[in-house]
Amino acid sequence: MVTAPPATAAGPRDVTADVLGGRDVTLTGDTVVTVPSGTTTYDGVFRGEGTLTVRGSGTLILTKDSDFTLPESRRRQKVTTQGGNHPYVTTTNPDPPAITVERGATLQYGNGGTTGLIGHFPYNTPAFRLNQDNIRVDGTLRLSLKSAYNLGTISGTGLITQPRFLWGTWDLSGTHPFSGVIDNGTQVNAGRPEFATSLPNVRKILNQGTYTVDTPLGRTVTMGMDFYQREYGSDINVQSRPGSKVVLTGQYSWSDQGGDTDPSLSDPALNWTPARKNINKRGTNIKGANVQWGDGTTNKIFMPGTAETVYINLLAARSRSLLTFDYNGPVTLGAPIGGGRFHDTLAAPGAGDVVIAGTRGNDVTFAAKQYYDGSTTVEKGAVLRLGSAQGDGSLWMDGDLCRVVNDGTLVVRNASTPVSLSRVSGSGAFVQSGAATTTLAGSGVTYTGTTTVRKGTLALRSGATLTRSREIRLTSAGARLDVGASGLRVTTTLTGKGTVKGAVTNEGVVAGGLTVTGGFTQRADGRLVLRDTPLKVSGGAVRLAGDLDLSAAGNDPDREITVLDNQGRGATKGAFKGLREGAEVKFADTVHRITYRGGDGNDVVLTAAAESPSASPAHAPASGAPTPGTRSASTADDSGLGWWPYVLAAGLLGGLLIPATRRTRRGRRRGGRHAAHG
């Protein structure tokens, strides 16, 4: 039976009695239903023109599809299909709501079947049916449908919820002012090639099913809400078309409190600890998409957890995937990135690339073994760390596409798990700071930034060299550079307090304070810089040529200064340029004589000698003018980059520091780095 409209109407028409009686209702304007407490199942339908408001304290279940529209005078929205051969739909100036669910009331579409939706579908939209009947939800809207459906434009502050395991599909198209909570128990398509989705005011989504983000061609979609999960098995799938990007700025967390309306986690540490029956296991599948975690304004990582609580799959679909980390502070990825199926993420390597964006403060730690076949790019200004107190980390390097492009800073700080890296390029810095050994292997190690060993061992193997590295620094006594059988060829600078295991050939700048366990050869274009302690060579031959630089030795030298402590048995061969055995050297107003047979018979030692008045004009102090070549030892700080890169650069461009000797008008030599006599 269909109820007849009244002859006159003052305010909204109340059809509660008709609904409770199961009668069909024809709308002729604004209409209300007051639902009593408990559950009311309505087997009738709504039709006509008007609006429907559901209020009260109970639940109204619709079992049949209803079709009505707003009065023509209130229709204003414009629906456009654009994109040519790749069509997508946009809605501008949306109509006011045709359905309103007031606070305290619950409207349920369907009862576990395929019918029960309110909607009008006049648009010939591609691949989905756009609903003209927009809805405002300040109470609760429950979607108990197995079919595919669309709700038009959604507003309000309430709860929209799906029961679990129905596997209906909600096509959530367009931009929605809704600011409440979405409880996805089944499947939400938040974007497709045919539409983009924007939810700028949504605070939280409780994801207990599959939440899929997709885009039309050439569109950037941002999801700024936090996602929560309560049960094992939920995931977020991300897809995108060529030229598109999906930006996720919130966090995907477990929830142990707050129910459906305000999910939250009592302790963030619970994301990193397996719960009973793994109910806090959640994941994301990136399917040939360009995905960015963060937008440079937050330091909450999207997927907090370990391999036991989260999974991350980087997959190829139409194209390889790209995952960018863009944060403004330190974040830790405690789980591996793989390419398996759902929870079995390590069944196959990931198919995509990873970027650490060059946002100021972006400092990302990988605290797990990564397993993706692709490039890892650290942009200028960014930091990527492998390993932390939460666990050791590494990059998989066995795939054909595996490589590291480092224009920022790459830090390896594993406690116990060795790391091997090959194909490392870029202009950025490399830092070894963990107890476990890091190995650079192969001829693909070509980066040009500074190499710093703070702790543990950095090893070079299979043809890897540091000839392009701007500076090599061993900043602690426990720092160790293992150069293997090939030895280390220094073409830039080598400084610090640590040990080089293997032979060193100096064609650049080497500073005292280091220990070399193999031989030490300094060629004609090399320079040895005297520091507070001598260069120690504990094994192998010592062959000298090139320059000795005393400008960093201080202004109050001892009467006897050891420049090179040759702890081997063989004689020191060769001599510094212009400093044959017994030659005089003046610095800090003191004349010293050099010997290559000092100490235990083969050390290079400077011994103070009495200054003769006639010789005084010939000895200019080496620490005179404040040029790079005459900096004191206190200015060469191991905690920073040091000043030797600038020394080397100045040398390459302008004759290398201060000339070893210069002639006066009378043709006599005066001291530069050193003044030699004999």
Where are the language model's segments positioned?
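Extracellular repeat-rich scaffold modules on cell surfaces
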Residues: 23-114, 145-206, 215-306, 317, ...
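Cleaved targeting-peptide boundary
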Residues: 10-17
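C-terminal segment of classical bacterial N-terminal signal peptides
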Residues: 1-8
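Generic detector of short, aliphatic-rich beta-strand segments that form the cores of beta-sheets
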Residues: 107, 142-143, 211, 323, ...
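C-terminal low-complexity, Ser/Thr- and acidic/Pro-rich disordered "stalk" regions positioned immediately N-terminal
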Residues: 597-639
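C-terminal membrane-anchoring or membrane-association module
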Residues: 642-678
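Extracellular beta-strand/loop-rich repeat segments of large surface/secreted proteins
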Residues: 426-431, 436-439, 446-448, 488-560
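Extracellular, surface-exposed repeat/solenoid domains
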Residues: 278-279, 524-608, 649-651
